[in-house]
């Protein structure tokens, strides 16, 4: 079997905020998308598209052969978006929830696909004021894609824990590091994927839903990981959007290296042990609730293991693959995330410090938005503040 290309592409969703009020821009001007289309058309880094809510926007990098190339593209997309939005009094924030937005105040983008979603899913989709990061890795063989999807699902909670950026919901500390997952889970066809023996079996299951008129195609299957409908890729979708660019590249590198590690096992007639969805879902919940703080269950040992220990084990597993891809620095950045916390940790820290400094609750929430605006466009290696966990 020929080794997959393992190309990489990254999609990120952002929220647009008003620079004066720091509230979500419920109805940004149409001219912004026109300007962005022109600005992005002048680069070869990727594309920008509207999202379900008018207050959201999505960027996607071009297909990249390395994490360095992906980082250059994603950094450029963030900068161009921020520069163009500033001309309209707006700013993007790479956070999976807004600290104090009210979903009932927002409008969805007038587009046939989104109109159908709004009609079908009603209040469930109107509450979807959330953003995620999707990482595509090129795996040309469709059956291999399905096999690796089943195996890498074990590691999805690890990736979620490293990306959490949604601790607040409607002005309150949700108590979860990723409240986005709680909101998104209200949609049908979400969560951990089923396992399939082949791509043909997967297609047969999808066709049942399509033939019954329930979905248009497999883009309406919103699992934490899925075979892409448009590209010969495996698409990781569990992640919150990372506020910091270096965190996003770390998680993309980890996902890519994990897939190659599992491919190496397959070439040696080995594979990662299959665990029931019940067990992986427990780790998914722990990542959603605690992020880096609570540890995950090692099912072989039958006990909760500190997340720092799990990351060291993971880094050892993928070391040969990081060397092949030349992304050692990106994967080792996981240790930095452990030290200073994810975006969720840092948002909570900024809020606590603002309150301790005498700010009102509303003022402290605005301070969190200011932190997110700055960190979204922070260059690689810039200081993120005090340690979080």
UniProtKB/Swiss-Prot annotation:
InterPro entries listed in its UniProt record: GCL_type2/YbdK_subfam (IPR050141), GCS2 (IPR006336), Gln_synth/guanido_kin_cat_dom (IPR014746), YbdK (IPR011793)
Domain of life: Bacteria
GO biological process terms held by the UniProt record: modified amino acid biosynthetic process
Keyword Nucleotide-binding attributed: yes
GO molecular function: ATP binding; glutamate-cysteine ligase activity
Catalytic activity: L-cysteine + L-glutamate + ATP = gamma-L-glutamyl-L-cysteine + ADP + phosphate + H(+)
Pfam families per UniProt: GCS2
Keyword annotations of the record: ATP-binding, Ligase, Nucleotide-binding
Broad EC category: ligase
EC nos: 6.3.2.2
Stated role: ATP-dependent carboxylate-amine ligase which exhibits weak glutamate--cysteine ligase activity.
Family the entry assigns: Belongs to the glutamate--cysteine ligase type 2 family. YbdK subfamily.
Protein name: Putative glutamate--cysteine ligase 2
Species classification: Bacteria, Pseudomonadati, Pseudomonadota, Alphaproteobacteria, Rhodospirillales
């Amino acid at each position: 079997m020929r080794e997959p290309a393992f190309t990489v592409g990254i999609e990120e969703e952002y929220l647009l905020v008003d620079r004066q009020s720091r509230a979500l821009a419920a109805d940004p001007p149409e001219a912004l998308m026109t300007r962005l289309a022109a600005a992005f058309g002048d680069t070869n880094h990727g594309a920008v598209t509207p999202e379900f809510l008018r207050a959201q926007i999505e960027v996607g990098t071009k297909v990249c052969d390395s994490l360095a190339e992906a980082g250059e593209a994603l950094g450029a997309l963030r900068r161009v978006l921020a520069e163009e939005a500033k001309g309209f009094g707006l700013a993007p924030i790479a956070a999976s929830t807004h600290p104090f937005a009210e979903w009932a105040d927002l409008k969805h983008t007038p587009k046939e696909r989104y109109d159908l979603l709004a009609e079908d899913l009603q209040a469930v989709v109107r509450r979807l004021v959330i953003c995620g990061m999707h990482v595509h890795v090129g795996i040309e063989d469709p059956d291999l894609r399905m096999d690796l999807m089943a195996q890498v699902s074990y590691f999805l909670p690890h990736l979620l824990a490293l990306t959490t950026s949604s601790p607040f919901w409607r002005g309150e500390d949700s108590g979860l590091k990723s409240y986005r997952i709680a909101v998104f889970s209200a949609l049908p066809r979400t969560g951990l994927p089923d396992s399939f023996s082949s791509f043909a079996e997967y297609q047969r299951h999808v066709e049942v839903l399509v033939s019954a008129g329930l979905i248009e195609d497999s883009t309406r299957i919103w699992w934490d990981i899925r075979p892409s409908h448009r590209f010969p890729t495996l698409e990781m979708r569990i992640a919150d959007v990372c506020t910091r660019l270096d965190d996003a590249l770390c998680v993309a590198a980890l996902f890519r290296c994990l897939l190659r590690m599992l491919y190496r096992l397959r070439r040696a007639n080995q594979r990662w042990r299959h665990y029931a969805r019940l067990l992986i879902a427990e780790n998914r919940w722990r990542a959603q609730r605690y992020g880096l703080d609570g540890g995950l269950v090692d099912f072989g040992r039958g006990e909760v293991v500190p997340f720092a220990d799990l990351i060291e084990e993971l880094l050892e597993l993928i070391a040969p693959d990081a060397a092949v891809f030349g992304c050692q620095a990106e994967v080792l950045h996981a240790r930095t995330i452990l030290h200073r916390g994810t975006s969720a940790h840092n948002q909570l820290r900024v809020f606590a410090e603002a309150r301790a400094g005498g700010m009102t609750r509303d003022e402290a929430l605005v301070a969190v938005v200011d932190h997110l605006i700055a960190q979204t466009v922070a260059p690689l290696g810039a200081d993120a503040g005090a340690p979080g966990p």
